[in-house]
Amino acid sequence: MLSQQMQNLGLPPITIGIGIATGFANVGHMGSRYHMTYTAVGDPVNTANRLQRCTGYYDLSLVVSESTVEKVPEFLFRELDTVHVKGRQRFVRLFEPVCPVEEASPDLHKRLQLHGKAMQFYRQGMWSDAERLFAKLSRDDLSNHEFYMKYVDRIQKIRTTRPEDESAHILDLTQQIGSL
């Protein structure tokens, strides 16, 4: 609502990015008797921070981890990527919440199924098949055209620079986006 009011005044909208990762963390008052603070620490806290920084790259307001997707079966998610972020040895699969399952139209289910197939081809290094599907999605789903064109561009770069690299599908964000 505030963002809309600002736009009505000709000001830029307020945009925020939220990253959500699910897992165990230590939360509470920590420190010494001279300096106490209420904080949260743990792997999911750090991962959520990295995911929050990814929101700008994908032009989204919310990015969640695979651990979160597993805990919310009543929601549909669109897989965004597999990334390597600073501070993590394991790769992180990123997702975007789409809508509650019961609210999804047959057309949306069909597009998400096609998207899932494109992501599967991409992860398997089947570049031609993945590029074909991402190009189709970019034409058919204009609201996500830029997102899908990122994949088409990445595939073209992979083909010319490292076509045999088994980890080429993993986006290395350890040195990008404000030192993720």
Task: Identify the meaning behind each predicted range.
Residues 2-43, 67-72, 88-99:
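Catalytic core of nucleotidyl cyclases, primarily class III adenylyl/guanylyl cyclases
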Residues 164-180:
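Intrinsically disordered, low-complexity, charge-biased linker/tail regions
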Residues 3, 81, 172-174:
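Compositionally biased amphipathic helical and low-complexity segments enriched in hydrophobic
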Residues 25-27, 54-129, 135-167:
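Cytosolic regulatory/linker segments at or just downstream of nucleotide-handling modules
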Residues 47-48:
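Structural preference for long, well-ordered alpha-helical segments in enzyme cores
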Residues 14-20, 155-158, 170, 177:
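Weak global preference for isoleucine
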